[in-house]
Amino acid sequence: MKNGALFIKVALLFCFMTGCSFMNEQQEISKPATTLIQSQLTSEGQDLNNRMLIIGTGDMTGVYFSLGQRLSNMYEKYNGAVSGTQVTDASIENTELVSRHRAEIGFTSVDVLDLPETDKSKLRALTALYSNYVQIVSTKQNDIDSLDDLVGKRISVGTAGSGTRLIAERILLESDLPTDQLNLSYLSFSQSAEALRNGTIDAAFFSSGIPNNEIAFISKQTELTFIPIPGDIIERLQKQYGVYTYNEIPRDTYRGMKKNVQTISIKNVLVTYKEMSDPHAYNLVKTLYEHLPELQHAHPAASDISITEATKQVPLDFHPGAVNYFTEQGIIGNQ
């Protein structure tokens, strides 16, 4: 498991050994302790009571993390799960963690699911979520208004295990810019924002729900430029991959924006591993939708989550437990 921060809401081992109650604090768990806890608590049962539930998220300033934290709280509150969130590099790493049973559920963008390194046979979808918007950001002083202006510039394209890096590299490849004249760095959302602020990079890619917290913060400090994705590049990406949608970043998303910005969006999905029991998966989905307003309160991007869209635009087999829930709700027919 990645040596990132693993947040657990209770002191797991102590309380399970002694039956005590404990203060509700976030606690970092080392790899050996996490492995021990999982071996003791993740046997599948009829519900989530006292089950260890790790959620793969992303950068601590991103939407995945905000929603993961809220989901964790919901599963503890309504299902009695012992739940926590894992800070990761996001989509690509999350699919790896879930497929290896190092996390029970994880957030990912659908374009990651068809990568050669993604073993779809080990993964199952629980529900479609909201969409990520590709946001290519610079500061006004850099005079970068188009993709062509990125030649010779310092650009952050996201961390190695992120969907941001995947789509950034695909866009740059389709732009036909000379790769030897692009100075790329691989920074998280928070690192990219800080580097834009202090001038150590000239532009950064962010693929996230809107508004992105880091972009919103720096837009209050300096005037930003949002670089549009040309229509011909969008068309080629749609034709080649089939998972990208033409969209626009509304002009009221961030301070200082004067017009909508043409871009692409990518659907997000919540995934689990194939071996999760049907009742367990059913309860995960049921709790999410029965208490959806609580999740939507965690970040504005979650306002786009809708049960009527829960099974759309997901190139992955759904878990039978999720299918059972959506069938009960009349979203899909009997399967």
Language-model features: locations:
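Ligand-binding clefts/hinges and TM-proximal coupling segments of bilobed small-molecule sensing domains
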Residues: 160-175, 243-317
